[in-house]
């Protein structure tokens, strides 16, 4: 297990069947096999147990912690409202791949939930956006001023609701636009695997065009990490272009290493490596790994399975 870094090759091969990862630190009692396309990686019983005491599932109404309400922007016309525990800071926004966000308020859990409902009802702001839609716009994001303006305008509309359904126990926080484009590596256009390391943004390949649909026994995913947003790793692959791997598809698989070729220089760290279901290393190693994708892929934006790639 190694640290992930932009510009570094990573790769693995899936082995055997995908098994349920269990729930809340407990092994799945059934040892159930789960579908390759499932992003949860759990059987129905373990999924139910995992959500049995969850803020997201509204089963923790008595949670005494302070919560924050946020406004998140993922692309043109793509905004949402959500809540997160104050002690977590912006971790939830990074997990969701929010390109830009601002805090709106802070207070008790139920006041935060009520604010979500008010924004949904009065402003039509959803509380969730499918990852597929987020991926579809990442290669075509506007500049920083337009991104910030979208969040500021939404904040102004939300703040205008004070006194009109806004819970009294929710303290409004000042507008502070946070842009995470650089953290995710999206400020640099993803380069193709064949592009020179010195290529400028204008010389680089366009945004990602394909995504991993599922892993399969013997399937290989390998490439050079160029961006990471939410659960998605953007990998430059041989022949040009970028493949997006939703890391939630990895859970429950045993993973084996793929051949390494050569060494690369030091690059900034972007996060911790991951492990397979049985703790096997994922071969996220700081070496140059040959680009190879041998799993079913789909066109980002709803296209069909790519022919000849599996």
Task: Describe these PLM feature segments.
Residues 1-310:
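Non-catalytic accessory segments flanking enzymatic or RNA/DNA-binding domains
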């Amino acid at each position: 297990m190694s640290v992930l870094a932009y510009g570094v090759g990573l790769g693995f091969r899936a082995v055997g069947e995908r098994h349920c990862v269990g729930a809340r630190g407990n092994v799945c009692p059934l040892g159930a096999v789960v579908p390759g396309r499932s992003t949860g990686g759990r059987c129905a019983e373990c999924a139910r147990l995992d959500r049995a005491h969850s803020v997201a599932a509204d089963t923790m109404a008595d949670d005494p912690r302070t919560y924050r309400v946020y406004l998140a922007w993922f692309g043109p016309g793509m905004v949402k409202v959500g809540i997160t525990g104050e002690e977590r800071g912006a971790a939830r926004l990074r997990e969701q791949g929010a390109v830009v966000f601002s805090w709106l308020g802070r207070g008790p859990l139920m006041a935060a939930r009520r604010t979500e409902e008010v924004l949904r009802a009065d402003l039509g702001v959803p509380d969730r956006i499918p990852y597929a839609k987020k991926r579809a716009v990442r290669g075509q994001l506007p500049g920083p001023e337009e991104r910030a303006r979208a969040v500021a305008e939404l904040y102004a509309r939300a703040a205008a609701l004070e006194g009109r359904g806004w819970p009294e126990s929710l303290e409004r926080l000042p507008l502070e636009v946070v842009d995470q484009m650089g953290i995710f590596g999206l400020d640099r256009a993803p380069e193709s695997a064949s592009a020179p390391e010195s290529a400028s943004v204008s010389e680089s390949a366009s945004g990602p065009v394909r995504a991993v649909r599922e892993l399969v026994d013997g399937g290989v995913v390998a490439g050079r990490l160029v961006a990471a947003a939410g659960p998605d790793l953007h990998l430059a692959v041989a022949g040009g272009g970028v493949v997006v791997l939703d890391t939630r598809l990895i859970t429950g698989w045993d993973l084996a290493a793929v051949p390494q070729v050569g060494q690369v220089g030091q690059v900034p760290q972007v996060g911790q490596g991951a492990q397979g279901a049985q703790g096997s290393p994922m071969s996220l190693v700081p070496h140059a790994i040959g680009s190879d994708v041998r799993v079913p892929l789909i066109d980002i934006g709803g296209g069909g399975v790519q022919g000849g790639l599996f």
